[in-house]
Amino acid sequence: MLEIVYQDEYLVAVNKPAGMLVHRSWLDKHETEFVMQTLRDQIGQHVFPLHRLDRPTSGVLVFALSSQIASEVMPMFANHEMEKTYHAIVRGWIEEANVLDYPLKEELDKIADKFAKQDKEAQSAVTAYRPLAKVELPIATGKFATTRYCLMEMQPKTGRKHQLRRHMAHLRHPIVGDTTHGDGVHNRLFREHFSAQRLMLHASELRFMHPYTQQPLVIRAGLDEVWQGLLSEFGWQESLLINA
């Protein structure tokens, strides 16, 4: 059963669990559970995704309730006429808010993009970010006697594939749990010490003008047990007041 965080006659939004594919994909031919099919069965009607959320990322995911609504609303999402807010735990301490303007080359999949042009120019990619809290743990990693982590709030201003994960890695502050762009030592530390098996990236909030009511709409998704446990462990509850 998916948690529905918003629904009206046009749109429905869920809190996507980490690790769940949005729809059937060649990425995992053996997977049997998908957000689209689960939500369709749950509400008894077809749904049409308006944007994407990577498999390991949790949080707000919005669907249209008809193909016509999807065709009318999708340009708004494609043109980034909304404000997305994510939260993440990253390696190291970031001391101040900033905006990273760092172009990214398109990441191509070996199978799905086999015939795509391989030498495309990097595309504009902009991310606003700010640190919310820090922690220093008495756990040695490499030559360091302690390890430092930071709770981050991020707002992507463009929509490149894996943008937040790649931008944080570029800053040398990879997101914990990122098996592609992250740091295996710290991913393993979180698995072994905190039973955190997931990517610590959550799509917390989506703000946009409702395409039919023309009223501002704010959709929020709460944090799962892994996130809640880490906030408690690190004393970060007051830094990130999102309802579970």
Swiss-Prot record:
User: Known EC number(s)?
Assistant: 5.4.99.26
**What chemistry does it catalyse, as a reaction equation?**
uridine(65) in tRNA = pseudouridine(65) in tRNA
Q: Which CDD domains does this UniProt record tie to the protein? A: PseudoU_synth_TruC
**Top-level class of the enzyme under EC nomenclature:** isomerase
Instruction: Cite the active-site annotation.
Output: D54
Check the record and name the InterPro entries matching this protein: PsdUridine_synth_cat_dom_sf (IPR020103), PsdUridine_synth_RluA-like_CS (IPR006224), PsdUridine_synth_RsuA/RluA (IPR006145), RluA_PseudoU_synthase (IPR050188)
The UniProt keywords, alphabetically, are:
Isomerase, tRNA processing
Q: Which GO terms describe its biological process?
A: enzyme-directed rRNA pseudouridine synthesis; tRNA processing
- Entry's Gene Ontology molecular function annotations: pseudouridine synthase activity; RNA binding; tRNA pseudouridine(65) synthase activity
Described purpose of this protein according to its UniProt entry:
Responsible for synthesis of pseudouridine from uracil-65 in transfer RNAs.
Q: Which NCBIfam families match?
A: PRK11112.1
- PANTHER family attached here? MITOCHONDRIAL RNA PSEUDOURIDINE SYNTHASE, TRNA PSEUDOURIDINE SYNTHASE C
Family of this protein = Belongs to the pseudouridine synthase RluA family.
What is this protein's record name? tRNA pseudouridine synthase C
Top-level taxonomy:
Bacteria, Pseudomonadati, Pseudomonadota, Gammaproteobacteria, Vibrionales
